[in-house]
Amino acid sequence: MSNYWLNIYKPGGISSAKLVSMVKQILGKKVKVGHAGTLDVEAEGILPIAVGEATKLIQLLIDSRKTYIFTIKFGLQTDSGDYTGTVIATKNYIPSQEEAYTVCSKFIGKVTQIPPAFSALKVNGVRAYKFAREGKEVELKPRNITIYNLKCLNFDKKNAIAIYYTECSKGTYIRTLAEDLALSLQSLGFVIELRRTQVGIFKAENAIRIKSPDEITKSFLEEKSIKIEAILDDILVLDATDSQAQQIKYGQKCIFDYEDDISLLWVRYKGTLLAIGSLNKNCFNSLRVFNVL
């Protein structure tokens, strides 16, 4: 089995790229490996890793909903939005428990967010955080995101901290959300702990934890692998005949006996993922074709 997903739990203190490198070291240098969504170095949590042909589906997973649990420290603001940064502002006001809980409703729905300067977004081909580290100002464009759920799990007035849970769309920066929450509460705040608990179908409770490539074998990862089609379970699937499979493989016109137009579906051949694409007037238009024939 060479095309699959791995549900990996990234510990804090290492980069997403480093974790991918560790997996590649275990599986072999020739194996194609990629991850579905960068996590901050100091953050921990779910980092889905695609192996082989699964890398062609990474964007679909990046587009899926994600859940996080994060802790805000009130009364201070840092340049990075988390505890690794330098304090740039302070405010004595600490919100009440009631305020910390009720503010959540203001953020549920479509929200405009300005990404933090300390982010991996590129500005003129250079990562924004590189400019930020040099003390240079970077203008990042606001982006539209969606907060599907936001709630306060715990509030500690004495230590001026609150723990929140959120379910959000792609492109959401939790550090920015935390700062905006604090500002809405007439205070300041930054993230002192961040954990991603779910990405699409991948959840923290059944994730693989890797501390060192020396302690995990290739066979162990393969045993824990998740089929490539798993992330497509809620998408329409059509079964291809031998002739249809050949047409799709070679980029030829392929007609299916299906009345509705479909913006995204996948085609299965002999029980295996063959392609993803759309259907327009019975004609299948491939977005990605997988090397399974």
From Swiss-Prot:
GO terms for molecular function: RNA binding; tRNA pseudouridine(55) synthase activity. It holds the Pfam family TruB_N. It comes from the Bacteria. It is an enzyme of class 5 (isomerase). The active site is at D40. Its EC number is 5.4.99.25. Gene3D superfamilies: Pseudouridine synthase. InterPro entries: PsdUridine_synth_cat_dom_sf, PsdUridine_synth_N, tRNA_psdUridine_synth_TruB, TruB_C. SUPFAM superfamilies: Pseudouridine synthase. PANTHER family: PSEUDOURIDYLATE SYNTHASE TRUB1 (PTHR13767:SF2), TRNA-PSEUDOURIDINE SYNTHASE (PTHR13767). Responsible for synthesis of pseudouridine from uracil-55 in the psi GC loop of transfer RNAs. HAMAP family: TruB_bact. Belongs to the pseudouridine synthase TruB family. Type 1 subfamily. This is tRNA pseudouridine synthase B. It comes from Rickettsia akari (strain Hartford). The lineage of its organism: Bacteria, Pseudomonadati, Pseudomonadota, Alphaproteobacteria, Rickettsiales. The gene is truB.
